[in-house]
């Protein structure tokens, strides 16, 4: 019979003198905790979407959840879970969105220059709804602005960003996790070489790189 694993402390980073800077609490292995973590993200998305919809605030689910939603339409076994809940909305609607989300229990904060809504006053930054502003660049050096919320589709309980717009966002950001999300879309056939002709040249080149060298 398997023996329970006793929680323990593990030293984390150390300074140059070898002194521990932090400790990490390690609990037992648990599939239930994994399932619970995924469900928390799902419920956070649904609560936020319901609050925005009830307040008539235009929005669209973006980010990793949008990728997962599109992937699931083709192959649910290829879905990659994400801890982020990203919502695309217009900056002029932030005030209305703030009132709506706070009424649903979220707490507005500025974190690293971003607008986030923590899932309660004691929530961690990971346990939050992250706002992505439509028609604006996330970072000044990026080649394209985000799409408008009108580029979205009704998914029943929420609106999700359209595939074309999602791909443009991911190619514009092009961080490691964005490339991973693009590979997921490529692997199941939602994105292929036919996309190159309809994309702005600067991000079409990025897609070409991924198509020619997926592991690069």
Regions found by a protein language model. Name each.
Residues 2-216:
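Compositionally biased terminal segments of proteins
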